[in-house]
A protein has these predicted regions:
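Short, well-ordered beta-strand segments enriched in hydrophobic/aromatic residues
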Residues: 44-47, 150
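A structural feature that tracks compact, well-ordered secondary-structure segments
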Residues: 69-72, 85, 141
Length: 150
């Protein structure tokens, strides 16, 4: 499956107009923003977990980044309320679930295999910086080599 795979092109997506698509596991739905591959793919998605839902244990061969938009996301490493950014490095694995339900912005398979740092940031209590244009604020989240997430 290929959706918005030309990363050299600028793109604006109104995610509210995209349909929720069921994932392979009950209670977990996705809005696909970008995808290059089938079920295991480089992907950018909005993922919604129903209350008391879970995803089976899996490994992220080229890493995972997510930002919790609503609710509380959980795995065996911790609980992540709305506003939490997490970078799970290449080769990491987890068994995600939620008691209350949650919505995430997720990027998969973008990280350098040599980037081994796990990052967890509470964006709601972090110090944001003035951006390059008036009214823009920026929060650096992760950096490795030439890749930066803010």
């Amino acid at each position: 499956m290929q959706i918005n795979t030309d990363l050299s092109q600028k793109l604006a997506i109104h995610s509210g107009e995209l349909p929720w698509l069921a994932s392979p596991l009950k209670g977990v739905d996705r809005k696909m923003l970008e995808r290059d591959g089938d079920e295991v793919a480089r992907a950018t998605s909005i993922v919604r977990y129903a209350p008391k839902s879970s995803f089976s244990r899996h490994q992220h061969d080229l890493g995972e980044e997510f930002l919790v938009l609503e609710g509380v996301f959980q795995d065996e490493h911790g609980q992540y309320p709305a506003g939490t950014y997490v970078k799970n490095p290449s080769g990491s694995s987890h068994t995600p679930f939620t008691d209350t339900g949650c919505t995430l912005f997720v990027k998969l398979r973008y990280l350098d295999p040599q980037d081994t740092e796990r990052v967890v940031i509470d964006t709601q209590s972090s110090g944001w910086f003035a951006g390059m244009v008036p009214g823009l604020t920026v929060l650096p989240l992760s950096s490795f080599g030439t890749k930066n997430t803010a």
